[in-house]
Amino acid sequence: MTNKLSHIFECSDHITEKQYRTSRALFILDGCASTQIFTVTSGAFLSGLAYLVGAGTALTGIIAALPTLMNTIQIFSSVVYENRAGSKRITVEFALIQRLCLLMMLFVPTLMLGARISVAVIAVLYSCAHFCGAFINTGANNWLISLVKKERLGRYLGLKDSMTLVASTGGSLILSKILDAYRFADQEILGFRIIGILCIGICVVDITCLTLIREPENVKYVEPLNIRKAIQMPLTDQNYRNILIFFLLWSVASNFA
């Protein structure tokens, strides 16, 4: 059993075209599934959950800003990924932890822990989830790109983003209707519990998709990468600096909004 699991996470240089197509399709399905979990633990859903356990506007705003803070870990995660033979194992493991933390948030109101403890638990779970998400972001993107030919990359990413957006919109409407139905019946805690149970099934599909995706062998840099190089190398590239400034401004505007 252990050998079979190890084989699943191994890189391979003998991947057929059919396996490449299947892996790309599974990445799209993974995006459609995972976005449901992210949707019900962010935005209006997160505000409603925090308010339900007794968090005020200020605390809710602080919790909502935690993902931006956690993104700083990407500097260190790039070093970890660059010095590893493959991205799949650590990506799947951290993705599972991320999803489980987000799912547990939905059941916090059921535990009736009191306002302070409940808010603290949600903040810790939310931080851990987005720490894991930020950590694997670089590796997951590289893993995805390794499965797509350069001339098809733009079209594939456009299709993936479109499908994810449709799934996110549809899922948000359905899940919000479910939550509203229970809220109007003064059973909002039960509503979050039902959504949590549905998301457990979605999580199983999500992680199964990630596990089944193949990972091709990638050529690594001969010289090991360290933290200093990871910071210096991008900053010496003018194009990267322009993109960095753009995303900094985008992040500030997005968080204000």
Residue ranges and their predicted role:
Residues 2-81, 88-98, 103-106, 164, ...:
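Helix-loop boundary and gating motifs at the non-cytosolic
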Residues 32, 36, 101-108, 115-136, ...:
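Hydrophobic core of transmembrane alpha-helices in multi-pass small-molecule transporters
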Residues 44-52, 79-83, 106-114, 168-190:
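Transmembrane alpha-helix termini and helix-breaking/packing motifs in multi-pass membrane transporters
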Residues 53-55, 85, 144-149:
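Short helix-loop-helix connector
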Residues 56-64, 118, 122, 192:
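Juxtamembrane helix-start elements in MFS-like secondary transporters
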Residues 87-89, 118, 177-201:
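A membrane-interface helix-boundary motif in multi-pass transporters
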Residues 192, 202-224:
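Helix-loop junctions on the cytosolic side of multi-pass membrane transporters
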